[in-house]
Amino acid sequence: MRILYLGTPEIAVAPLELLHASGHEIVGVVTQPDRPAGRKNVLTAPPVKLAAERLGIPVFQPETLKDPAAVARLRAFEPEVGVVAAYGEILRKQVLAIPALGYLNIHPSILPLYRGPAPVTGAILAGDDLVGVSIIKLTAKMDAGPILGQMVMPLANDARAGEWTAQLMRQGGELLAQVLPAYAAGQIQAQIQDDSQASYTQMISKNDGLINWNLPALVIERMTRAYDPWPGTAVKLNDQPFKILRAKAHTSWSGTIQPGTLFEQQGQILVATGSGALELLEVQPAGKRPMAANDWRRGAKDIEQL
């Protein structure tokens, strides 16, 4: 079966490698153009491009798939089916119509929950106990296509969005490798999503990780995991970002201390919040490397408020 693979970031590398290793014929890889990256704005290739080149798969990097010339190039690959894994552009109907079997998408959530660009972040913020990955057939409506395969697993209490997104995408690649042959043979009974049960996530912005100490400690602790690695969770300290990398919520703590006030208790570095206290475990002051909160506090005894 001739597969056209569309993906861009590091999390889309594992599914590509798994499909290749399982013997599927990948006729081409479509990925975003090389972009400037880092402080020096060095032109950098997407991780999926580098992986495809290692595997000897032809690579196509259009600026946009809205361009008729790009659509013609996709047709020239003569794919029977397409696979999409974090490509970075919504596919229009003329692109969706190219492969006879359409496009399959790996989405790291238990659809119809958490449609959109940040499903694992959404699950962590909500305090969910379960997470999963779904294989769907793409339709014009975002993440709303019929489900061809789904895997559900417990979400660890210390789950961090970046790590778990990568893990779920890898497991999605394994699931996809199993689904594809059965799908091509017409042996899968697709499950239509119940739109009335759908929930949605939004694109994450840099300001989403800014802490409001009036929020409950449990909410802030979830933020430190949901916004890892980007944008991170931080406060402004002397007009500079002070990142809280790891923390623990003490929901049973109660006091009359103003939210945002630093205090110590039994060797723990704590911050009062709107409900409970947040124990700081690992922090990163501006311009410095990550460090244990206790080490930071020894050199910052004069700071009383975050």
From Swiss-Prot:
Domain of life, per lineage: Bacteria
Binding site for (6S)-5,6,7,8-tetrahydrofolate: S109, I110, L111, P112
UniProt key word Transferase: yes
One of the record's GO molecular function terms: methionyl-tRNA formyltransferase activity
GO cellular component, one term: cytosol
Reactions catalysed: L-methionyl-tRNA(fMet) + (6R)-10-formyltetrahydrofolate = N-formyl-L-methionyl-tRNA(fMet) + (6S)-5,6,7,8-tetrahydrofolate + H(+)
Transmembrane regions listed in the UniProt entry: none
Annotated Pfam families: Formyl_trans_C, Formyl_trans_N
Enzyme class: transferase
UniProt EC number: 2.1.2.9
Gene3D superfamilies found in the cross-reference section: Formyl transferase, C-terminal domain (3.10.25.10), Formyl transferase, N-terminal domain (3.40.50.170)
Coiled coil location: none
Keyword line: Protein biosynthesis, Transferase
Family: Belongs to the Fmt family.
Function noted in UniProt: Attaches a formyl group to the free amino group of methionyl-tRNA(fMet). The formyl group appears to play a dual role in the initiator identity of N-formylmethionyl-tRNA by promoting its recognition by IF2 and preventing the misappropriation of this tRNA by the elongation apparatus.
This protein's name: Methionyl-tRNA formyltransferase
Source species of the chain: Herpetosiphon aurantiacus (strain ATCC 23779 / DSM 785 / 114-95)
